[in-house]
Structures are given as structure tokens and as C-alpha cells.
Design a protein with these regions (language model features):
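Sec-dependent bacterial lipoprotein signal peptides
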Residues: 1-21
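Bacterial lipoprotein signal-peptidase II cleavage site
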Residues: 5-6, 21-47
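Active-site- and interface-proximal helix/loop "cap" or "latch" segments in soluble metabolic
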Residues: 51-60, 66-180, 190-304
Length: 304
């Protein structure tokens, strides 16, 4: 999967806020064998100068997520501690059936580094560091070169932990990562509007395959961003693409590729593509568990 890095621009045109909303608000059990790590650390300082303007506060406690299946002999274990409403420590690891971390697998480290120039000792530490730096701003977590799928999986799970912390639900999240998707319709919706729009997203699974993907951005009247001709024209002037093009393209790509990790990032709509993949990953996890309850995301919105 091609992944471009999100660049927070210094655009001063009045259009910038409008265009950035196409890059949305803030994925994946689908990861390649490059996923591995053991990293635990305390948050030293706050992420960026961006100010949170919407989204639920985090409730104090320790929140955990575990994969239930072993992939290439390892499964993810992840935890996040919140104190005084702030993330104070994070832990992310891949363990084998004996509880041994993949970071201690010297053969794996050597083989992966030879192929993609980054091994679990490096990218796990970097992902954890980025989580510490950016806190609840999951969209700002770095995608590590050579470990793209692992990075997107990390972001998906970090997002789920943040949602749990907003709800104060300390029950361990279990991800049936090696399970088949069960038939049904799975739905996710954002609660908060960013530049006048919020995400609505559903996938339909039949015979274990995604047959429909309905991702959209709607305003308070329920009108799709694809129908906003002014927005379309303004965004196309700057990014050469608008919601009328990138929204159906993302939906089409998910049905064709059957995996969020394989969805192509639409040039000019990188942030929206990343958000799409993040939420698609969460919907796939729901389908693997057969949980058709609507996922309500009290999405955290930052000022531009």
C-alpha cells in the first residue's frame, strides 16, 4: 500500500481550512509479517501546538487491547494509561506464545532490516515515541518507512484505545485479527463536525467479503460533501481533486482490494485517505467479531 506522509502546510490562503477538512479527522488488523515490537514508555511532553476544540475528554485508567490470534507466531498487546485526563504512558508489543517479545527475535530483526532497512527494534520505538508526542491526535502519528502496515495497525489500535478512554471502558479490547469477517452491515459515525462535516461510514459483508462500502462526509442537514459544488471547485483549484472524486474512489478501492491496508491513497486527499483507512480497519475488526453495533466516534477535532 502506498502511503504518503501528511504534511501540515503553512498555507495562508483562506481556503486552507476548507481544503484541510477534505483531509478529515482522524486501522489495521491487516498487517504484514513486518509487524513486531516491544516498547513501553512514559509521555514526556505534549504533542503539538494544536488546540482541541471538540471531542470527549479521556477518563483516568489503564486501557488495554489484545489480538486473539497469532500472525506469523506473534500477536499484539497494547496498553495506554491516562491520568488527570492525559496519556501518561503507552505500551506496545508483539509476543509469541511464550510471552517473548518480537524485539528479541534476532533472526527476524536481521531479515527485516536486510529487506526494508527497519526492524522491530527501530520502528516499534519510533511508533511509541510518535504516540507519546501526538497524544490523542492519532492522525499525526508517523507512518514509518518500511513498516507501513504495522504503522497503520498501530494507529487503528491507538484510536480504539482512545475511544475506550473517552468512554471510561477499561475492559480489554479483543481483536479477532485472524478471524474471517462475518456477514452483516457494520456502521461507524463521527459525532463532531469539522469544518461543517463529519464522517459516516458503513460496510456490508456477504459470504465473508466486502460487497459495499459507503463512506461519506455529511453536514448538519445530512447533505453529502460530494454535492457541495463550491467546496469541490475550491479544493480542486488547490489539490487537483475534490470530494466528488476521492470519496467514490476510496469506496471503490476498498471493495476491489478487500483490505484497508491495500487501499490506494488518493493524491491530493492524503489525510482523508488515511482517515478512511483508519475507520475501515475498525469496521473490519467489528466484522471479524460479528459485532453489528454502531461504532460512535466522539472524534477529537483540532483547530487548524
Amino acid at each position: 500500500m502506498k502511503l504518503s506522509k501528511v504534511v501540515t502546510g503553512t498555507a495562508v490562503v483562506a481556503l486552507s481550512a476548507l481544503v484541510l477538512s477534505a483531509c478529515g479527522s482522524s486501522s489495521s488488523s491487516s498487517k504484514n509479517s513486518t509487524s513486531s515490537k516491544a516498547s513501553s514508555s512514559k509521555v514526556v511532553k505534549k504533542s503539538s501546538s494544536q488546540k482541541q476544540v471538540a471531542g470527549g475528554a479521556l477518563k483516568d485508567g489503564t486501557y488495554k487491547l489484545d489480538e486473539t490470534g497469532y500472525d506469523h507466531g506473534y500477536k499484539v498487546q497494547m496498553a495506554m494509561t491516562v491520568k488527570d485526563g492525559k496519556i501518561t504512558s503507552t505500551k506496545y508489543d508483539y509476543v509469541d506464545k511464550d510471552g517473548k517479545s518480537k524485539t528479541k527475535d534476532a533472526a527476524y530483526e536481521k531479515a527485516m532490516k536486510a529487506k526494508v532497512k527497519a526492524g522491530p527494534k527501530e520502528y516499534i520505538r519510533e511508533l511509541n515515541k510518535s504516540f507519546q508526542k501526538n497524544g490523542t491526535n492519532v492522525g499525526a502519528i508517523d507512518v514509518i518507512s518500511g513498516a507501513t502496515d504495522s504503522s497503520m495497525t498501530f494507529k487503528n489500535y491507538a484510536q480504539q484505545l482512545i475511544q475506550a478512554a473517552q468512554a471510561g471502558d477499561t475492559k480489554t479490547i479483543e481483536v479477532n485479527n485472524t478471524g474471517k469477517m462475518q456477514d452483516g452491515t457494520y456502521t461507524l459515525e463521527e459525532k463532531n463536525y469539522f469544518n461543517g462535516y463529519r464522517v459516516t461510514f458503513s460496510i456490508t459483508v456477504k459470504d465473508g467479503k466486502i460487497t459495499e462500502s459507503n463512506y461519506d462526509n455529511i453536514n448538519k442537514d445530512g447533505k453529502s460533501k460530494t454535492l457541495d459544488t463550491k467546496y469541490e471547485a475550491n479544493m480542486k483549484k488547490v489539490n487537483k481533486v475534490g470530494p466528488k472524486e476521492y470519496i467514490p474512489e476510496l469506496n471503490k478501492s476498498l471493495v476491489a482490494k478487500q483490505s484497508p491496508a491495500k487501499v490506494d491513497v488518493v493524491s491530493g486527499a492524503t489525510h482523508s485517505s488515511d482517515t478512511f483507512i483508519l475507520y475501515a480497519d475498525q469496521l473490519v475488526n467489528a466484522a471479524q467479531n460479528g459485532n453489528t453495533n454502531k461504532i460512535e466516534v466522539d472524534n477529537i477535532v483540532y483547530n487548524n
